[in-house]
Design a protein with these regions (language model features):
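Predominantly soluble domains enriched in secretory-pathway, periplasmic, or organellar proteins
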Residues: 1-173
Length: 173
């Protein structure tokens, strides 16, 4: 049994290789780089335009040498990280609080936003589902929900050709 300590508030882990993984955090403006074989932190990736108090990175998916990360709480961006340099090389603005991230079999990224909440200092809007081209890192389509809807837990099926999410019921697209 091994353990990696001194992380702020770890959320998700993505394995780049057997000896390198990224660990996202909430309430930290860094993504930690760890060596899972040696149980140690080897570095971190600074997330632009975030403070430690407003930092929030969540789920990760990989396309070629790039890892995409959704920035959730009080954020509205998807980050693109070059795994060879461990640096953020792109940012894409989406709606308030992208809560889930997935990549389908056609190399399209999908993210669903929760829209924040009424009275939030960051804002409150209708949530949206976004389809993003991983190659060009641009939004191809936005599907808007109603204000007050709460889409979450977006997932793809096993063949990665059908999208599911929860919003009071289980939805399929």
């Amino acid at each position: 049994v091994g353990r990696i300590t001194n992380l702020t508030s770890p959320r998700y882990i993505h394995f780049v290789s057997d000896e390198k993984a990224y660990v996202t955090q909430i309430w930290d403006n860094r993504i930690f780089i760890v060596n899972p074989k040696r149980y140690e932190i080897t570095g971190y990736i600074e997330c632009p335009d975030m403070t430690a108090e407003s930092g929030s990175t969540e789920q990760m998916v990989q396309y070629g040498k790039y890892v995409f990360v959704n920035c959730w709480s009080y954020q509205n961006r998807i980050l693109k990280i070059d795994t060879e340099t461990d640096r953020v090389v792109g940012q894409l603005t989406v709606g308030i609080q992208p809560a889930s991230l997935a990549m389908d079999r056609n190399n399209k990224l999908w993210t669903v936003t929760d829209g924040g909440y009424e009275g939030s200092p960051y804002g409150y809007e209708a949530p949206s589902l976004y389809r993003i081209d991983a190659e060009t890192f641009s939004v191809e389509k936005q599907f808007r929900f109603r204000k007050g809807d709460s889409p979450s837990e977006m997932q793809l099926n096993g063949t990665r050709d059908t999208l599911y999410w929860i919003d009071r019921d289980v939805w399929r697209m």
